[in-house]
Amino acid sequence: MADQAKLLFYNKMMDRTAIKHLIRRLISHFGITFTANILDQIKTLGFHQATNASISLGIDDLLTAPLKSWLIQDAEKQGYSSEQHHRYGSVHSVEKLRQLIETWYATSEYLKQEMNPNFRMTDPLNPVHMMSFSGARGSISQVHQLVGMRGLMSDPQGQIIDLPIQNNFREGLSLTEYIISCYGARKGVVDTAVRTSDAGYLTRRLVEVVQHIVVRKKDCGTLRGILLNSNRDGRRSIQPFSQQRLIGRVLADNLYVNMRCIATRNQDISNELARRLVISQVRQIYIRSPLTCKSMFCICQLCYGWNLTYNHLVELGEAVGIIAGQSIGEPGTQLTLRTFHTGGVFTGDIAEHIRTPFNGIIKFDEDLVYATRTRHGHPAWLCQDNLPVSIESKEKIHNFIVPAQSLLLVQNNQYVGSKQVIGQIRTTKSPLKERVKKPIYSNLDGELHWDTTVRHLSEHIHNNIHRVVKSGHIWILSGKLHNLSKTSLFFYQNQDKIHVQSPSITNYKSLPNSSEKDTKRDLDFIDSNIAKKESQTSNFGFSFSKITPNPSDSTNILSNIELKRNRRKNRVILLLGRVKSRYRKKSYSSFVLDIPNNGILNQGDILAISESPQYQTEISGIIKYGTIKVDSVGKREYIGDNEKTTTFRSRYKILKGGNFFLIPEEVYTIYQPSSHIFVSNNSIIEPGTQITFNITSRGGGLVQIKKVRKIFEIRILPGNIYYPKRLHKISKQTDILIPPGQKIFDEFKSDNWIYLQWITPYRKKTFLPVRPVLEYIISNHSFIEISSTFTYSRYRDIIQVQAAEYIFYEDGEEVRIRNNTSSIQLVQTCLVVNWKEPSIVRVAYVSPIEIRFNNILKTFLQISLIEFSNAYVEKGNSRASLKRLFSNQPFYSNNANNHLLSQFPINHPGVVRRLSDQGTDRSFVVLLPSDSYQSFYSPCHDGRNRRKQFVESRYKISFCEKEISERSNTLFLSFNRKKFLKLKEKLTNSFSSFDHHCMMQTTERLGLLGTVHSIAHYSLYSHRIINKNFFLSKDLDIDNSRAISQNSNWYILDENRVICGFDLIDSTQEDLSNRPHYLSVPCDVIIPFVNLGQFICEGVSLYEHETSYQSGQIIAIYQESVMIRLSKPYLATKGATVHSNYGDILKEGDTLITLIYERLRSGDIIQGLPKVEQLLEARSINSVSLDLEKNFLFWNNTMIRLVGNFWSHFLGVKTSIEQCQLFLVNKVQKVYRSQGVQISDKHIEIIVRQMTSKVITLEDGMANVFSPGELIELSRAQRMNRALKESISHKPIVLGMTKASLNTTSFISEASFQETTRVLARAALQGRIDWLKGLKENVVPGSVVPTGTGSREVICQIDIEKRKELGLLKTKNNKIFIRKIRDIFFYHEKVSISKNPKYIHMRLKKPVLKEINI
């Protein structure tokens, strides 16, 4: 019994924490037995008082906080605002989810904090309040779910569900909330998705790896230990230097405070000593650890420390290994079973907010901050250094300093209210995070478009992966994709043109079902010379009326040109006849059509190409021009290498035939160091010589090596080497081509062309390689008869096609054969389109068409022309494949007076686009909305300049010319935004008066559907005005009524995925200014520039009082309205990945982009258990630690003592493995402590010790002892190195739990864990012996396990320790003791040996033999 003065006295309310502290002090003062008696009395007292109070729990006792409705309403308002910003494209889905999670988490936490004050004010004696807050039953989180709100839950994969449970159990859950709640709790069939088996399997592996660890010694005698440093990790989640981590450990060295020793070596740390150390703020404590214990297959008392159950040193024979495994695995099981986990799962650290003390104007230096985004996607300003900020009001000024790396949420000189959040202070230690990829899926069907900087990844050159290098929007243009099976009756091919007049279609039906077998497929052939065409009604499912085409708009089918389709290569072959000879029949030359995807051909464009095999080469070399003459200016164009990559290449037109040469050589680019190159410069090699490890020369010759930065370029020059003495007509240092028959050296003439190249090595004689040359000859006249090809064409007096030959390389340019190319074409014959009257700008629409005539299917070429006299035509010939969506449904349209128009079918020209879908039996047919071409033509040549001078002189408005293409300029008005001019009269009147002298007329033509003027590419030329020419009136009204002479129809694909037609002027031809919704803007207001093709987001103001209610692209601008094609913007931040090409068609649900963001490593235990398993299985971690700077400083200070040390490499390895062990211990602790689970460090250290106890032998070790790559115990390797003359080289390795369990000294333990057949077969072949030292290998055969405080070997060990301490162990009794103990211990190291020299000499002869036999 303790003294009366030391008795404990408490006079306060006792909660759970106070009860714990009381029990701990009672055990330390009175012991376990007396403490149990006291606690039994306290229990009886508690039951007595509870019985007298009659406390019971009813549903009426669950009181909901009155602030809940207001808090939820405010959170819903913030969620709606976040959803609205996401719809605008201001934030992406990750930022929206992040803000939603933090909003509801803050709401839930605030509601939890308001519970206790609410109970205290309304009902202090509420049973729920008394039981939960006293710790008797239930926790605050559980009560919060009863009377507060359930909060956010996570799914089985650990992802947070973005729909919070707003109700509590008192109010009742809805069906949706109940299903979501089943994920977080254990109810229903959803429980099968919760991975409860993972925690059990984790426990089994942990126990398996440490089941043989038993306390068998009192002191191993080690001088090593681990260092506990209070500054190692300052995060709030884990405190490495705390009182709880010190209790029960043993000091490895004396401990001094202010030069005074307060604790000695091998002293255990009690509660009082731990409290003194924490109060004294000792920074470093050197303690003993299982990681540094010298015992090989066991552990000693002092390295393990206290048994925390009894608060004294662990007893000998204690199976601490199994205790450690269960201590780590069981909390995971309990957490998975939701014993500790309740309610909300969000565990993020919210940054500290800066609030204003009063109303005022905030001021700071704008030069010290820069714009950025918050983690919620909101605009903010980041300050690099400490930022002085002042808030000024009428009466006072408040100055303060914002710490560095903090965010300001307001702008300079902005008015702020009292208690308003104006900034966020960055936490000193950010929690450890990991990079996670979040896929974003498309919400609608349509076409992909982006307006940000997106680059194709070099490592993904053969697929469609792109990387966003600058934050911007990814757009999906709405549309509908129609599928047609290959068996459907659809006779149009890709790029075929459907050309009919507007009044011609009287009846339009959908295509028939392909299952109708009686469908006739006869179609009359339309000859190209018939001016008035008439098609008969057929059974295709739709009918045509009489067609009377306009001569300038009709299509001409060239029936005398034969085309063939190559289905396999997806090519169209054009066959042209050669010139007939007297003895030979007419032969044909094949050309491959090279028509752009839009079908537009301009002056000088290439119609078809032909590649002759005689101008192909399969070897690399250098091109040298001979007698040919080539145009000096090359034509640069896009060449599609395949479906996924596009490159540039240049053509040079051959003006005059002759010859050119290819000088062969082999070229290799080496990215390896020079030590990997096996040949030397200016050496001569034979064919098949090894150049590097993986490169072998195909030919022989002179080797030339050139280094450019870190890249080596190796050239092998074939030919012969000559050392000339006398030259004939050849100047030195000049490379030259020598024709056949010319004498070069004494008695040397070549029968073929050769190339001489002078080479002067350093300090060596000049020599001359004579290199062979390949000659190519090009004739001076074209062998293709072009004139008769278009004889029957109505355009023969307008268009002409000429054959021209082009070469792809300049003089001296290198031809390089890549690994993936078999040959390269040097010369190409092309058919070029030219106009006979160059002054008239024309555009030709060319496309192949297949026509069935008497069951014979033939392919012909159709051509249509549109000409513009002195026009300014906006055009493009991009070969990029465009995909637009079109519907064949009828539409309804409303005019400005809201009059409903009659049902009107689609009746305008279009081009059918068929997109092949590889691997399926379907193909996609895409109809595209028509484009509008606009031409401005005038009878006078200088009308445009006169108009420009007239307006500039009268209204002082400047004009600017912007180059749109090589042959067209467009006129633009530009105003000074700062000083907006007030126009006194309408510009349109001035233009009208001016038009008496120089008329300007607007004409429209519907172009081919799917050309480069399609919707997506308007943004590339956003400064163009295509659909209409607008003029400004004095009231700044958009007045175009005077410039329109006829009723024009517009047909556009709208957001409802149907074709909409709009009349620009109704049938009464009334002036548009009289419409009721006419937009009028005052003179002092600046009209924003709205361009065709411009993308706008929802909520953007187009004019002063006009706001867009949908996100989309402007596809038409009218007198009083703007038409927008429905689009969906997706915000893509820097580093995001786009998974499709520009212009690709996506379906709803397809993966659009992948965002990369950071999240906390451990949240819910569902996420934490896999991380524990990842660490204990020694798997690689993808993310890099954020504390690189701190780790570098630590390593820098640690490694200074190793510099210059002879054993520095050994010490470095030792330090590395020690740091690795501590890293694993701390990481596992972080996962559990983030969930509030306390696990002693010694348990994890025992596991980590077994993971790092193996080493792997290297190749330079002794092969007769261990095989290279064999796993052995570290202690065994050290003993072998001491016994053998030649040491064994080995390196440390970290094994996972499973791998360590399968590499032990007991094959019985291994076979009972995994791979039983393999382990037993391998052990039998190796002749292994199991010494049955552990627990599991004794359980299998039914033997007594060698553990327990009362076991035979433990009693003998205790007897040995006592006799050693008393000095009673004599030499004569050594033999008896050794004989008795040998039956128990199987390793001689366990036996304590006296200092008798004779006995030591005798015993040292046996250990090596025993170890080898093992």
UniProtKB/Swiss-Prot annotation:
Recorded GO MF terms: DNA binding; DNA-directed RNA polymerase activity; zinc ion binding
Domain of life: Eukaryota
Family matches, as InterPro entries: DNA-dir_RpoC2_beta_pp, RNA_pol_beta''_euk, RNA_pol_Rpb1_3_sf, RNA_pol_Rpb1_4, RNA_pol_Rpb1_5, Rpb1_funnel_sf
Origin species: Angiopteris evecta (Mule's foot fern)
Cofactor note: Binds 1 Zn(2+) ion per subunit.
Record localization: Plastid, Chloroplast
SUPFAM superfamilies per the UniProt record, alphabetical: beta and beta-prime subunits of DNA dependent RNA-polymerase (SSF64484)
Chief subcellular location: plastid
Keywords annotated in UniProt: Chloroplast, DNA-directed RNA polymerase, Metal-binding, Nucleotidyltransferase, Plastid, Transcription, Transferase, Zinc
Subunit and interaction comment: In plastids the minimal PEP RNA polymerase catalytic core is composed of four subunits: alpha, beta, beta', and beta''. When a (nuclear-encoded) sigma factor is associated with the core the holoenzyme is formed, which can initiate transcription.
SS bonds (residue pairs): none
Name the UniProt record assigns to this protein: DNA-directed RNA polymerase subunit beta''
Top EC class for this record: transferase
Record-level GO BP terms: DNA-templated transcription
Annotated signal peptide: none
UniProt cross-references to Gene3D superfamilies, sorted A to Z: 1.10.132.30, 1.10.150.390, 1.10.1790.20, RNA polymerase Rpb1, domain 3 (1.10.274.100)
GO cellular component, one term: mitochondrion
Cofactor(s) needed: Zn(2+)
Gene from which the chain derives: rpoC2
Binding site for Zn(2+): 220, 293, 300, 303
Catalytic activity: RNA(n) + a ribonucleoside 5'-triphosphate = RNA(n+1) + diphosphate
Function field: DNA-dependent RNA polymerase catalyzes the transcription of DNA into RNA using the four ribonucleoside triphosphates as substrates.
